[in-house]
Swiss-Prot record:
Gene behind this protein: rsmH
Provenance organism: Corynebacterium glutamicum (strain R)
A GO cellular component entry from the record: cytoplasm
Protein task: Specifically methylates the N4 position of cytidine in position 1402 (C1402) of 16S rRNA.
Enzyme Commission designation: 2.1.1.199
Protein name: Ribosomal RNA small subunit methyltransferase H
Subcellular location: Cytoplasm
UniProt KW Metal-binding keyword: no
EC category name: transferase
Reaction catalysed by this enzyme: cytidine(1402) in 16S rRNA + S-adenosyl-L-methionine = N(4)-methylcytidine(1402) in 16S rRNA + S-adenosyl-L-homocysteine + H(+)
Length: 337
């Protein structure tokens, strides 16, 4: 979830805001007052506010595990009154929200399905700006990194308790860190002297562990390790795996789900799921789809879309975003309505 450029009193304009609205516009506008949008990564509420302004008849369900973000978003979206409901949960709590939470908007979603959904993955600019959260590596801060600060393990817990093998695996898998084993060895050696508590000590360790030639060409040496720790702390990949079938099940015919990924491992998961879901199950060689084997979804984006050069120039945080969208074209019985 990456933001860029200033937006009045609310911090940042969301990445690719206009394109996100355009991707869900047709079905949302067609459903009118029956349209329910899900912003599953509500953050500061920038995308949600734009959607509610752009589609004045639509309702919106906003999800966020971060209680501070949810508080601020509720205040920002208060002028929309009963057109908005915010729920504190991880985004893979979507199914439980639709099944268990009471409210007129939830009832509407149960009856008509979801018209459009947005998943803006990763950490938000708001969270990066809150130094005490420990997401940023350029300022010394507690090694926390929890998106929900009320529960779960911290980055310090991982560094101080995980085995060499587990630390190396996390850094390699979630951060594409070439020197994962060397860094893991250095962590175990350092924690014998004193437990890790703040980010500056970890950054210093990474400067020492990563060769100078790599530091000169590979960006900030802490970037990949901090990313990997954040993904592990917040169980981000499992949440993504869990929510993909939840949202596609919840879409109505014509409904679209849009995913904005900032890391390769996220985009690969989304790409594979979309490919599987849009591929016919009819055995190869047959001229037509057998009953019950035709795909119920189609991919809306051709490959992954990216931010424009102008947007990237205004804020480099938009540079890595990859956008993929999928649309339900038939219901579970194969009907087109």
């Amino acid at each position: 979830m990456e933001d860029f450029s200033l937006d009045g009193n609310h911090g940042h304009v969301p990445v690719m805001r206009d394109r996100m609205a355009a991707l869900i516009a047709e079905n949302v506008e067609a459903l009118g007052e029956n349209a329910v949008i899900v912003d599953a990564t509500l953050g500061a509420g920038g995308h949600a506010e734009f959607f509610l302004n752009t589609f004045p008849k639509a309702r919106l369900i906003g999800l966020d595990r971060d209680q501070n973000a949810l508080r601020d978003a509720r205040a920002r979206l208060a002028p929309f009154g009963e057109r908005f409901i915010g729920v504190q949960t991880r985004f893979d709590g979507l199914r439980e929200v639709l099944e268990s939470v009471e409210g007129d908007i939830i009832d509407l979603a149960r009856e008509h399905g979801i018209a459009g959904a947005l998943f803006d993955l990763g950490v938000s600019s708001m969270q990066l700006d809150q130094v005490e959260r420990g997401f940023a590596y350029r300022t010394d801060a507690p090694l926390d990194m929890r998106m929900d600060a009320t529960q779960g393990i911290t980055a310090a817990d991982i560094l101080n308790t995980y085995s060499h093998g587990d630390i190396a695996r996390i850094l390699k898998t979630y951060g594409d860190e070439r020197f994962a084993g060397k860094i893991a060895s250095a962590v175990l050696k350092e924690r014998e002297k004193e437990p890790f508590t703040t980010s500056a000590r970890l950054v210093e360790l990474l400067y020492d562990a990563i060769p100078a030639a790599t530091r000169r060409t590979g960006g900030h040496p802490a970037k990949r390790t901090f990313q990997a720790l954040r993904v592990e702390v917040n169980n981000e990949l499992d949440s993504l795996k869990n929510v993909l079938p939840q949202i596609t099940d919840a879409l109505n015919v014509g409904g679209r789900a849009v995913f904005m990924s900032y890391q390769s491992h996220e985009d690969k998961l989304v790409k594979k799921f979309f490919t599987d879901l849009t591929t016919s199950k009819t055995p190869p060689g047959l001229p037509v789809d057998l009953p019950g084997t035709a795909p119920q979804f189609k991919q809306v984006t051709r490959g992954a879309e990216t931010a424009s050069e102008a947007e990237i120039e205004e804020n480099p945080r938009a540079a890595p975003v990859k956008v993929r969208a999928i649309e339900r074209i038939a219901n579970n019985s194969g009907d087109l309505s």
